[in-house]
Each structure stands twice: as C-alpha cells, then as structure tokens.
Swiss-Prot record:
Expressed by the skin glands. This is Des-Arg9-[Val1,Thr6]-bradykinin. Produces in vitro relaxation of rat arterial smooth muscle and constriction of intestinal smooth muscle. May target bradykinin receptors (BDKRB). GO terms for molecular function: toxin activity.
C-alpha cells in the first residue's frame, strides 16, 4: 500500500 494508506 502507498505511504499514509492504512487498510492492508
């Protein structure tokens, strides 16, 4: 996942 994105 991209930085700052929490889900999975």
């Amino acid at each position: 996942v991209p930085p700052g994105f929490t889900p999975f």
